[in-house]
Amino acid sequence: MGYFYLTAETWTLLVAFVTLLLVYAYWPYGTFKRLGISGPKPVPFFGTMLHYRRGFFTFDEECKKKYGKVWGIYDGRQPVLCVTDPEIIKAVLVKECLSFFTNRRNFRLNGPLYDAVSIAEDDQWKRIRSVLSPSFTSGRLKEMFEIMKNHSANLIRSMKKKADKDEPLDLKEFFGSYSMDVVTSTAFSVDIDSLNNPSDPFVTNIKKMLKFDFLNPLFLAVAFFPFLGPILEKFELSFFPKSVTDFFYASLEKIKSNREASQQKSRVDFLQLMIDSQKNSGAQQDKSLTDHEILSQSMIFIFAGYETSSSSLTFLAYNLATNPEVMKKLQEEIDATFPNKAPVHYQPLMEMEYLDCVINESLRLFPIAARLERVAKAAVEINGVVIPKDMVVMIPTWPLHRDPEIWPEPEAFKPERFSKKNKDNIDPYIYMPFGSGPRNCIGMRFALVLIKLAVVEILQQYSFSVCKETEVPFEMDIQGLLAPKRPIQLKLVPRS
């Protein structure tokens, strides 16, 4: 009769392996206990990531209620310090932003986006940001406004076809195409007209790019075994689909080459400012971007511009449809600012007070950046909290924006919270839909102009209305970016 037999040496090796595996599995999970910081109990390898199955925003909200203003979680083996204390937030995002903290954590598997402004660190980040910033001044935005209006007019025409048939609209489809068209035309002087060409490869590829899952095997592998990051990077593995990044880099390379070869003077857009930086000489030469950096910034601008603007417009339309009294008041301001459906102009649009209140309140409920991250470059103590070197500091804006102690009836849509009378009472380190400090969202003002123009021109002619296809309240998706689980659908009702 056969039996299972192991030599003493084999048993010794097996016990040693299991011991080392257990040490590896449990080693990082004493970090917050040593720092005197409470938090949910981690499990080996996963840390506290299994809680994300119900949505990271739900998890953040529950932790804030249970543990207060500071707590610790573990993304796999990575300790993450979560803070909602305004004093600590101010220090991390502003006061000590450049001296003690760098950008969000880098999982390394960024593919060709390794030098995008959202991933670059320290001096490289400063150089890239300084080149990009002039693209978003008031003067530049005013120049872009007429281009945006061409696409907002196209948006209205496309929506009208649905309204005329009394059919519901999938908001993300329309606002996504509008955002894509505005971004590509203002940034690269290229008109793809994705509103009339929904199968355009720019749109289909960006949708593939946005399908990110926290339980992606590649993401989990790096979370469980961080040392695998550099190894997998050598094999050119990436969180982003290679076919998608290849498409965008090839398209942008072609646009850039055509621009450089053309003798015609192009308007000064996002791409041109980056190309011009390469023509600097002397001391200014150090501020120029490489060819690859130009392509990476272009790619991230498409990615961020599409998602943030289209999602914000979708949530805003839903909030207006489910709060018709707010929509009516906003339409009254629109009619007073642009009587008899007059053409929308930049300056009056920027001065609309109630419109600002409505957008700010929608961004409170559904912030573009539901989590902000920084990484400590050196050990530092802030407001009595010790932050070790390499610690990830995470600021969860979702629970900050819905804290009942700060916002009475936090789930209610009340734009008056941001009125002239009340807005001075709002702590800028509590309300941060675009982040805060030197590393805030560089395209914030661009996104706001795009959003304001679309909503005003739509509400000049129509009202948003819930219909039998509208899910009220809608269920949030638990994976990846802040988004509804199912598409939000509304109807447009013509105004009398």
Curated annotation (Swiss-Prot):
Cofactor section: heme
UniProt topology in membrane: Peripheral membrane protein
Main location: endoplasmic reticulum
Subcellular location: Endoplasmic reticulum membrane; Microsome membrane
UniProt-recorded Gene Ontology molecular function terms: heme binding; iron ion binding; oxidoreductase activity, acting on paired donors, with incorporation or reduction of molecular oxygen, reduced flavin or flavoprotein as one donor, and incorporation of one atom of oxygen; steroid hydroxylase activity
Keyword DNA-binding among UniProt keywords: no
Residues annotated as binding heme: 441
PROSITE patterns: CYTOCHROME_P450
E.C. no: 1.14.14.1
Keyword Endoplasmic reticulum: yes
Protein family membership: Belongs to the cytochrome P450 family.
Protein name: Cytochrome P450 3A30
